[in-house]
Amino acid sequence: KQLRGLGNALAEYHPVIEVIDRKFTWSVGREKLKHPLIYIQDSIANKNAMFNINIESEQVAKYRTQNVIAHIPSKKMCAKTIVFTAHYDHLGRMGESTYFPGGNDNASGTAMLITMAKYFKEHPSDYNILFIAFAGEEAGLVGSKYFVENTPIKLKKIKFLLNLDIMGSGEEGITAVNSTLFEEEFNLLNEINDEKKLLARIKKRGPAANSDHYWFTEKGVPAFFIYTMGPNKNYHDVFDTYEELSFVEYDDITNLLVTFVERLEKWESLDWYN
């Protein structure tokens, strides 16, 4: 990480070529370097080769995009809300020919968001259900930050938020970020999983600023960031395609989360939970 930071710093003064021994990945930047920063795999760095690079770069400082929000009202009067979120942006292109599909990150989570919306439209909840597809996650959780700072709802009315990001596998189970903060709800997930025998495991993980749940957590909203674990390691690269995803536990994860919301409804009648 220190070397990566050094490369960025040096590129403010002159072009930089950095030889790396890690996988090529791509990301979205919100600032434009003054000079090129070029990465070369160490496997070809020592070969006698010459190449020319023509780089054209433009920073669109005020690019406009949007969050997409949908709402299903509760089947009876209820002031509390369950929120499902997923970011629908990815990395786009690098030049004319290099395209980053973002199958797992995060077309898979966006698909599950739509699956949840379809389910709760057909099976209304005692809660209000809010669905948010965020833009700008890859650029630094921009869409979710904007929503929290300009929210059309009272955040204190959110009973729980479930953020769906990287949902395309599951052979090794799922991880629940923030589960160390919300032990009762994490135990409920495991209780449901043990009862229904859905997933290999539900891994506990502490808070992290790595997806759109983060800004909600900072405002005191109870939230989990759920992501799948499995053999597919294609992340922020050109190989993150639909064809590489197994979706082997997609239905089971849907079952788990739907049941989680339904069990929270039952908890509402218990004094200790309110």
Residue ranges of each PLM-predicted region?
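Second-shell loop/turn segments in exported
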Residues: 1, 56-58, 96-106, 133, ...
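Active-site-proximal beta-strand/loop segments in catalytic clefts of secreted hydrolases
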Residues: 1, 19-22, 41, 72, ...
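Loop/turn elements at helix/coil->beta-strand transitions in domains of secreted/extracellular proteins
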Residues: 12-15, 78-82, 125-129, 156-160, ...
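Soluble metallo-hydrolase cores and metallopeptidase-like ectodomains found primarily
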Residues: 20-102, 118, 122, 126
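Active-site alpha-helical elements of protease catalytic centers
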Residues: 103-116
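Short glycine/serine- and small hydrophobic-enriched flexible loop segments
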Residues: 114-121, 146, 191, 259-263
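His/Asp/Glu-rich mid-to-C-terminal helical/loop segments that flank catalytic regions of hydrolases
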Residues: 118, 233-274
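Metal-dependent peptidase/peptidase-like ectodomains
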Residues: 134-234
